[in-house]
Amino acid sequence: MGISRIRSEQGVLRGLYKFRFTTERGTGCGVMFATSGGRLYGGDSGSSFVGRFSEADGIVSCEVTMSRHYHDPKFVPMFEVEHAVMNFTGVSRGEEIHFEGGSTALPGVHFATVLTPIDDTDAPPPGAVGPDGIGNGLYSIHIRMLDGIDAGNTGVMMLRDGSIRGGDAFFDYIGAYSAANGRWKGEIVNREHTPSRGERPVFGGHEVGIGFSGTYDDNGAEGEATALAGKRSIRFKAVLRKLVEIED
């Protein structure tokens, strides 16, 4: 079964969201996917977020583990910890869910977080995945542009039964893939969910179609891709590393 595109009743998380958090140290954004079984998988440019949620009497309760996936020495994270268990409670306000919470690993830091649904109804249908296809999971994705372009990007990507959902601090990814015998290929649409302020000017403001192909094993995958951004055609290489298995 592919990734569900149907949202449940108001007050219960389901599907793809962007999140924005505000703390005493600053703000940040990313993406989060909520499964029908109460699991959460997401992340941003530097960290992944994996956890679970429940809902009772209009209150959504979450426990999420934040783990660093990007360790480039030039990258300065907002929080110095490698891992932190975070707890939140939230309520629905229209389509959004507003959370408050924090972590004992980050004393004195209070998180005010808003989840806003992302429309993925126009995503391509799931691709065919063979019995030895790439494993379902949450992966980190590290991108490096080719052809002399000195640029790159990092984020997270959830692969599940031929469907792709993911993103980073500024962009969301929706797509599909097929995989068998150590080879995979697919398509992704890269969309800006939060203004990128020039962080990725090539993709900023565009809905970018991307086709890719490559190889995979039990630990991750890699591939080369071509992105069509406006009138430009841009090639890049992507490396995926499996972070966790996923559950419904």
Go through each PLM region and give its residues.
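Short beta-strand segments that buttress and anchor functional surface loops
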Residues: 19-21, 40-43, 64, 99-104, ...
